[in-house]
Amino acid sequence: MDICVFGAGSLGSLVGGLLADDHEVTLVGREPHVRAVRKRGLQLAGEFDRTVYPGATTDPPASADLVLVTVKSFDTAAAAAQLAGGAFDAVLSLQNGMGNEETLAAHVSAPVLAGTCTYGARLTDPGVVECTGVGGVALGPPDGGSSELADRVGTALAAGLETTVAGDMPRRLWAKLAVNAGINAVTALARVPNGDLVDGPARTVAHDAASETARVA
């Protein structure tokens, strides 16, 4: 499958790198990372230890079988505008936050799938991405249920990623948001690593943030 990873930062580079052995992958990212991948390949470190050789560019291709969108959610509208007019069979958001699928669908003609990803990734140097934790990808129609397209994309991703095709993506998106609210926001504000929330004084704040998200959901 011809796969474009739009947003080749930490997560996008890791996901694209893990798929590059079995698919024709193009990473769309920024310099100097793109230049390094072109010159030396993409080095996978941490939980994985190998070098792969995806394509790398700063501009999205005009066509692809699948686009994986991994930009930060505040960049979704800009990414959607850049992808508009492209000939794609499917677009899959692997982003945090809510509403990314609707933003993408308003610009691209291809069907949009929802997804979550729990792999940990860190871009340590240009051309080098470290996997800090092996997780999984869940994907499916953004309104829930099943589809032949989701099954086909899930089969393709399973070549390099732990993949689940799920019929309850709305629930999974909210659950991921609750986890992010309870962990990411609190650790950033308290300037502590994730593990300090388990028994530290910020545990109550993390619990309350996740619970509030669940009530909103």
Where are these regions (language model features)?
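Hydrophobic anchor at the start of a short beta-strand
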Residues: 3, 24-25, 91, 112, ...
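Internal alpha-helical scaffold of NAD(P)-dependent oxidoreductase catalytic cores
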Residues: 86, 103, 107, 130-177, ...
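Short amphipathic alpha-helical segments
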Residues: 16-18, 39, 80-83, 103-106, ...
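Glycine-rich beta-alpha junction loops
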Residues: 32, 96-98, 116-121, 135, ...
